[in-house]
Regions:
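Short, low-hydrophobicity acidic/polar segments
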Residues: 3, 8-125, 160-176, 181-200, ...
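Acidic/polar low-complexity flexible segments
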Residues: 113-161
Length: 208
């Protein structure tokens, strides 16, 4: 996890990397002492590029390039804490939030007398490529994406196990690592294309 610690418009800790887990984070970049002032903290994952604010009334940004291949997409998290004074116990808690949209799919049976096999699921018309996220808004929340990339021509193909068994009439294709991780956006031109087949009494019907 990368971090930025700012005194107004100047960075006190610039791009310092921390490693560890909840309650146990450490850096090999040296020892830092709290200055006699309020601080702002910005945290972000290592898969992004950080840009410092241009002025004292601006916020930093991170840029990210969303891979077209879902298996290469990452879960991007950030944290922001403003106007912090030195804690009496020397402990600072940062609450991270997910800033991409996680998408999984499940299919509900229309007629239980049929056998359904979903062969492919593709999302088209959703913008990808490069985007910039600006910190700000309510502490611990907020921030905005500016998506400058376009939607990939072939869309995003959802990878799943189509041999799963229906439970209570629903095929749930969610697995540990098969989520689509896309930018939050208005999907006015987006489509979900599902290719599937149904079987009954040795007869097969293919639909899209």
């Amino acid at each position: 996890v990368g971090s930025e610690m700012c005194i107004r418009d100047s960075a006190y800790m610039d791009g310092i990397e921390y490693k560890g887990g909840q309650g146990s984070w450490a850096t090999t970049s040296g020892t830092f002492y709290w200055p006699i002032t309020e601080m702002q903290f910005f945290g972000y994952t290592n898969d992004v590029t950080y840009t410092a604010p241009a002025s004292s009334n601006a916020y930093p940004t991170i840029s990210y390039t969303l891979p077209d291949t879902p298996a290469d997409q990452k879960d991007i998290i950030v944290a922001y804490s403003k106007d912090v004074t030195k804690p009496s116990d020397n402990t600072l808690n940062l609450t991270f939030q997910h800033i991409l949209t996680r998408i999984n799919f499940a299919v509900k049976l229309v007629d239980s007398s049929y056998t359904y096999t979903v062969e492919s699921i593709t999302v088209t018309g959703a913008k990808g490529g490069t985007a910039t996220y600006t910190f700000g808004g309510t502490e611990g929340k907020g921030g905005n994406w500016n998506i400058t990339g376009s939607a990939p021509a072939s869309g995003y193909s959802y990878t799943f196990d189509n041999t799963v068994t229906a439970k209570d009439g629903i095929y749930d294709y969610t697995q540990n690592d098969n989520s689509l991780m896309l930018y939050p956006q208005s999907l006015t031109d987006a489509k979900i294309i599902v290719k599937y087949k149904t079987e009954k009494d040795n007869a097969t019907s293919v639909s899209y």
